[in-house]
Amino acid sequence: DKVAKEAADDVTTCGIGHTRWATHGGVSDTNSHPHTAGKVTLIHNGIIENYKELQEELAAKGKEPISQTDTEIAAMVIDDCYTGDPEAAIRKAISKLVGAYGFCIIFSDIPETIYAVRNGSPLVAAHTDRGSIIASDMVALVSHTKHYFVLKEGHIAKLTKDEIIVKDENGEVYGPYIHHISWDMASAKKGGYDYFMMKEIHEQPEALRNTIRPRMVNGLPDFSADGVGDELFTDVNRIVITACGTAMHSGLMGKNMIERLCRIPVTVDIASEFRYQNPIIDEHTLLITVSQSGETADTLAALRLAKERGAKTLSVVNVKGSSIARESDYVLYTHAGPEIAVASTKAYSVQVAVMYLIAFRFALVNGKISEKDAAGFMTTMIDTVDKVEDALTYDQQTE
């Protein structure tokens, strides 16, 4: 905000910025984004795994970085490939990169244009009557527009104030699918609370009801409105749940309930380690991925590995049109709305709720519980939501 206020309107109509954890090197201005190398300036969300090897290749050409970051190496690689054609340089450069990245790039000789490309890390973009905008999360867009698109992996977006042009891996112009943001700017503000976390704690009852009630038909768990048929739960002899961070803890809750009701073995793996374990997966395995954003790079990689090995795949995500949602066989959306706070609250609660719903439906389909049992579980869930709401009325007394 400070930079935006200090920059006069006539200085530029194009800019990029990014706040990133100090994953490489210390916290310093030198290691901060954007990074510039020659004619290339970029910001980067993700991690370049082979940056050391690339740094050695650049050093052999007499090119040394100023910072300690993998991002500057990426900028140097793109600049090294640049001969006047931005898209050709980006294509050549990303063929050398290993890892996750979402790049927004400005070339100094084309200063009013942003080029964007991604692999693993999310990028969403929109064109409005005030220009073009791109970000890693749609929360950043909601104050500007209700419509956006998700940039596909390997596609290159060219953003100017007048338009956004997207090209696929073959250089052909691609018309992306436009998504609608169903919540408004008020959902992304504190709404009278001191902190986003406190606001989101109090939003749990509504989020839980929005997640549970559409899946309750005649008192029973039902996913037909989600397009998830009972065939997903048949011919399965093993369930694997994979996720990262808080989402993985919801998976542990799911494991407990699924094993208890369905009497089927369930393993929960942290997604960042899943690929390196050579997991035992086949066509009789159901892989459940859990991710609030639907863009968690390690979870997405785990999903792809499971699909390669023939597993059925089901994702539990909050963001429609996200990569994990698109690439899964089946999707169950949580309806938490935006979660701004770093500490997960309502997103975790609805993930647990969906895991329980999966357990109830799986057990019912396979004859492990009766309809009466299933209806009782659903009633208990709704009653629990009411109790959560009641408990939150005592927040002032417990502070």
Task: Enumerate the language-model features and the residues they cover.
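Conserved short alpha-helical segments that host acidic/polar catalytic motifs at enzyme active sites
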Residues: D1-K190, D194-Y195, E206-N237, E371, ...
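Residue-identity detector for glutamine
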Residues: Q55, Q68, Q204, Q277, ...
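Active-site cores of enzymes that catalyze phosphoryl transfer or operate on phosphate-rich substrates
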Residues: K190, E200, V342
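Well-ordered alpha-helical segments embedded in enzymatic catalytic cores
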Residues: A89, A207, V228, E273, ...
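Glycine-rich phosphate-binding loops that contact phosphosugars or nucleotide phosphates
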Residues: T234-D383
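Accessory alpha-helical/coil subdomains and C-terminal extensions
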Residues: D383-E399
